[in-house]
Amino acid sequence: MALQAQQQATPSPTRDRAGSGEWLADTEKLPGAAASPEDVVVASTHHAAAAARYVPPRATSHTAEPNPGRGGGGGWYSWNGGRRARHDPPAPRRQQPAKTPPPAPPLPAAPPPPPAASPAPAPRAPPPHAQVRSADRVVPAILSRKRRAAVMQRAALLARAAAAGLCLAALAVLASDTRRGWARDSYSNYAQFRYSEAVNVVGFLYSVFQFVALAELMRRNKHLIPHPKRDLFDFTMDQVVAYLLISSSSSATARASDLIENWGSDSFPSMANGSIAISFVAFVVFAICSLISAYNLFRRDM
């Protein structure tokens, strides 16, 4: 730093009594060329000697706005300072709204109580003429049902008697067919004829049993077998015997035809054919008995 001293006829400098360290009227500033904050020249006009002293720069200061609210410069600064940035006060913090729990769902409304059950109305008594009409309808229905049951029993009795007679005739004809023809042949030598003879015996015995049971039922109103099992037994046995008759007659017919083709026609195969024809008729009668027993089994008033 360069310091310059200059003697002038000015009063000697004096210090402020308040102790602020500033020079009073005995100091003067130099022109604008030496007015920088870095180089300051102080001239002393003391008559004894010129003294040079370094004066530190002042801190930057800011004055209040002279005319607030009217616009303008917004205040002035000292010569040796720059404009300081204005620090705006921090914005107030935004308060977060308090989190409130969601409202509880409303409770479901209680269902209304069920209405009281009203007593059922008393049944109306039918008029007297309706009772008379219902009685007139029931009695004929019962009588017709009894007549129908009696007719079915008579038909079943006749069918049993016919089946027993036919089976007896068939087995008698075939049993007499021994030592017949030019070969003196017998039915016992052929399995088909023996099978037909056995089935005719079974059919005859079963038909006799059914005939006796039906006669006892019609006379005393009592059957040898209880009612629920009786109809099922009759239906099953009629089906079985009818199947045996048709199968034995078919096999015996095939055997008799074979004998006629091989050895010619004579009395032996002719009697066998007669017995087979009677067995076929017995099968038809057993089929009718099966229909009657099925009606008795599946009728409504069982």
Curated annotation (Swiss-Prot):
Sequence ranges of Pro residues compositional bias: 99-129
Enumerate the Extracellular topological stretches. 176-197, 257-273
Report residue spans for region: Disordered: 1-134
Cross-referenced InterPro entries, in alphabetical order? CASP_dom
Q: Where in the cell is it found?
A: Cell membrane
What top-level branch of life does the organism fall under? Eukaryota
Instruction: Topology check: give the Cytoplasmic ranges.
Output: 1-154, 219-238, 295-302
- Where along the chain is composition biased (Polar residues)? 1-13
Q: Which residues form a coiled coil?
A: none
Report the GO terms under cellular component: plasma membrane
- Kindly list the residue ranges recorded as spanning the membrane: 155-175, 198-218, 239-256, 274-294
Q: Where is the composition biased (Low complexity)?
A: 40-60
- Its membrane topology, per UniProt? Multi-pass membrane protein
Transmembrane helix found in the keyword field: yes
Alphabetical UniProt keywords = Cell membrane, Membrane, Transmembrane, Transmembrane helix
Q: Kindly state the subunit structure of this protein.
A: Homodimer and heterodimers.
| Family indicated by similarity | Belongs to the Casparian strip membrane proteins (CASP) family.
What this protein is called in its record is CASP-like protein 4A2
